[in-house]
Amino acid sequence: MEGLTLSDAEQKYYSDLFSYCDIESTKKVVVNGRVLELFRAAQLPNDVVLQIMELCGATRLGYFGRSQFYIALKLVAVAQSGFPLRVESINTVKDLPLPRFVASKNEQESRHAASYSSDSENQGSYSGVIPPPPGRGQVKKGSVSHDTVQPRTSADAQEPASPVVSPQQSPPTSPHTWRKHSRHPSGGNSERPLAGPGPFWSPFGEAQSGSSAGDAVWSGHSPPPPQENWVSFADTPPTSTLLTMHPASVQDQTTVRTVASATTAIEIRRQSSSYDDPWKITDEQRQYYVNQFKTIQPDLNGFIPGSAAKEFFTKSKLPILELSHIWELSDFDKDGALTLDEFCAAFHLVVARKNGYDLPEKLPESLMPKLIDLEDSADVGDQPGEVGYSGSPAEAPPSKSPSMPSLNQTWPELNQSSEQWETFSERSSSSQTLTQFDSNIAPADPDTAIVHPVPIRMTPSKIHMQEMELKRTGSDHTNPTSPLLVKPSDLLEENKINSSVKFASGNTVADGYSSSDSFTSDPEQIGSNVTRQRSHSGTSPDNTAPPPPPPRPQPSHSRSSSLDMNRTFTVTTGQQQAGVVAHPPAVPPRPQPSQAPGPAVHRPVDADGLITHTSTSPQQIPEQPNFADFSQFEVFAASNVNDEQDDEAEKHPEVLPAEKASDPASSLRVAKTDSKTEEKTAASAPANVSKGTTPLAPPPKPVRRRLKSEDELRPEVDEHTQKTGVLAAVLASQPSIPRSVGKDKKAIQASIRRNKETNTVLARLNSELQQQLKDVLEERISLEVQLEQLRPFSHL
């Protein structure tokens, strides 16, 4: 302070500003308090503001003392005058004007302040103007503004008509007038002396009581009235009682008032009681907002994406935190885009904030999309309001309010802050926004929930089992319906946990093979599929007999019989039950497999062990065609198929030789035999189901689906040796078949259990991690807020 020389006007002006910013009267102004608003009103780039804070020493101290504050104000004036920003410039620059602070809501006042700044030293009254903005509510300040404004308003009173009539065009042509207008609302009575403006600028107190008159005048000039009344809320209250102050002081006061948005908002609320809802959008404003919307989105029924809205609203030069709060309020449906109603609400909030109103915590009812009447606004398309943005602040729709002009002025500068918009969502005024993002980002839990249904979806109901399997036979991989697949691959098991259980239960309910019930609708198709699988070595889709077996004597003979059986199966698919009973005595393995699809197979199982075994083998065969069609699963079920084939080889020596014959024919035949063995195991499972071992039947079927041709070949060789065995051996092996099936089912159930447990653990872990992520993000937000408080200009 020692080296700082101030004129009387500067001394008074700076002292008033310091008193205004020193809310707690501690002689130490917090960096992130009103000083932040004051420097924002200076309309300097962020880097310049930071440099000023650095030069004055506030950054180092963490607060503004009186000396730091005065130096900062001097540096602001230096920067605004275009001189190099150095401490030496404070005293070297002669006739340095007073710093100009343009509150967004009162750009007009800011212009007045600028004009005063040119006469700063002559305007010792400046100090009087600046009595701390908190005094906005005070009568003194308001009264001063009225008298001082009157001389200017006289000129303005004439001008206002044009801006009112054509707010868009007139503001650009007479921006000063517009500024004055907005000032007049603040200084309400300044124009009373003038007959024309009188009604417009009646003192605020009168404006409240006689606002209707003012409105009527404005109605003559539709666009301005909303602005006047709207903007005047903050400024007019003091003006109503005060008419004695000098115009210069009044202007200064108005600028300061605009800076003190908090106190102004409080008074606005008090004094707006007699007014209409301050958040209500007038027709003129609606028209302007709609026109602005059309410039971005021609379709009024369309929406503006978040990126376009960001670019548009950053031109308002509002802080990122405030823009983020406005976005939260206006994006009513949280879809990341703005409809016409939402855009109008957002625009209205921006205008209100530029005019010094505090943003509401919740979206006012009058701005709710459902309550916003935009019907007429759609027709308003001529207003060049957006041009006003890029052009002059005055262009900002007069209909909106003086605040709009301020938006226009700062529009190009606001583009600078567009880069910071990215922080918009991150820096949302409250951590709740981020929490919402987390909840949206954290649909991991929903995903897991979806994952569980996936297996259910993959396992169709019994009604659709047949069609699903028939289709899947064409595309082998998608065979989740069969629980056997669960065994071959754990992944399938997880997806099929529910399906396998349902499938088994369904089979048991359906007489040992509920799938047969589901298949009963198309037993012929099933039989054909079975024959296909048996003849799969020949890869013939039809029920035609399989290709001739290799030169192996026994296999060929058994193969021929099996082929005959297949033919009979195709013929008797509809009569599988009766055929099953007749065939078991002749050749238990082949005839029964073709007949197995029918529930009769289970009946033979119950009736006799032989019949059951033969029926199981036929059942296995028919089921295998369904499963055998899933050639892609052979790789997975190879091991299971081999085990089952071994068991069945012991159980059904005759059936095994028949399969051997098919195996030598080709690797495909081997796959057929594997499918047959799988079918056998499946058949044994249904047999068990009928006996009361229903759960066993379903799992073996899918597991025994063709997996690896090589593995299958090996078991087939064993089967050939076993096939040489007698039917007695087969009968003896029959009990072992259900046992093996039981073992298989137990293994499958165990794997399902393990997979379920693993899935549960992972789901819990996922939810815990999501919660941790939320906590971390919230902590990050709080830290960022603290950091911004310590470095308030980092986000300007």
From Swiss-Prot:
Coiled-coil region(s) at which residues? 751-791
Processing after translation: EGF stimulates phosphorylation on Tyr-residues.
Its protein name is: RalBP1-associated Eps domain-containing protein 1
Give the function comment from the record: May coordinate the cellular actions of activated EGF receptors and Ral-GTPases.
Provide ranges: composition bias, Polar residues: 115-126, 145-156, 407-433, 506-543, 563-574, 612-623
Biased amino acid composition, Low complexity:
575-584
One Gene Ontology term of the biological-process aspect is:
endocytosis
Sites of Phosphotyrosine modification: 288
Q: Where is the EH domain?
A: 10-113, 285-374
Q: Which residues bind Ca(2+)?
A: 331, 333, 335, 342
Asked whether the UniProt record includes Coiled coil among its keywords, one would answer yes
**Disordered: region residues:** 105-237, 377-433, 506-624, 638-725
Q: Sorted alphabetically, which keywords does the UniProt record give?
A: Calcium, Coated pit, Coiled coil, Disease variant, Membrane, Metal-binding, Neurodegeneration, Phosphoprotein, Repeat
Could you tell me where the Basic and acidic residues compositional bias lies? 671-681, 708-722
Q: In which tissues is it expressed?
A: Widely expressed with highest levels in heart and testis.
The root-end lineage is: Eukaryota, Metazoa, Chordata, Craniata, Vertebrata
Q: Where in the cell is it found?
A: Membrane, Clathrin-coated pit
Identify residues that carry Phosphothreonine: 173, 544
Disease linked to the protein: Neurodegeneration with brain iron accumulation 7: A neurodegenerative disorder associated with iron accumulation, primarily in the basal ganglia. Clinical features include speech and motor delay, truncal hypotonia, progressive cerebellar ataxia, and loss of ambulation. NBIA7 transmission pattern is consistent with autosomal recessive inheritance.
